[in-house]
Amino acid sequence: MKKNLRYFALLGLTALSLASCYKECTYAEFIESAKKVESVEYTKATFSGKYVYEAAGVTSTLDMSGTEFTKESGSWKASDSNKATQSVFGLVLLAFKPADIEEDTSGKTKYFYNDGFKVESTEDDKTSIAEWDNFGYLTSMSFDGNTVTVSYTK
């Protein structure tokens, strides 16, 4: 009996996870769906994660953990003005919407939608992934093993 319960529980969890998975689609389907997102207003966005990058032989780390933004008069404002680089990077990410994605005709980009939106692009053995919720708000940005996530509060 316990085995049957575990089996049905596992089957149920699998069905739930498959129901909320992204579905690969064409660019036209992706952009059409992205233009029809429902409107919701979040009042707070909190970032987590680090972005490590190298330029001209110098490695830098941008730690976004704990960086917060509040929405005032329709615009995102950084909660800590002492984190200038995090504030600028965060504002750019908060403004990035799925409807802003341009079509990549090289075949290196895949588009997904269903329970939110996702774009996955691979070039020079480096993969970048952007994910948005159903309302078009960025929830995750990954590049070359670095991931920055955003959580929202209404």
Q: Language model features by range: what are they?
A:
Residues 48-103, 147:
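An acidic-aromatic
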Residues 16-19, 32, 38, 59, ...:
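Intrinsically disordered, low-complexity segments enriched in Ser/Pro/Gly/Ala and basic residues
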Residues 15, 27, 44-47, 60-62, ...:
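N-terminal compositionally biased, intrinsically disordered segments and leader/signal-like regions
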Residues 16-22, 41, 50, 62, ...:
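Serine/proline-rich low-complexity intrinsically disordered segments, especially terminal tails, linkers
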Residues 58, 63, 110-154:
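Gly/Pro-enriched, hydrophobic low-complexity segments
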Residues 15-50, 91-94, 105, 115, ...:
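N-terminal leader/targeting segments and the immediate start of mature chains
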Residues 1-20:
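Sec-dependent bacterial lipoprotein signal peptides
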Residues 40-44, 99-124:
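Short, positively charged, low-complexity/disordered linker segments
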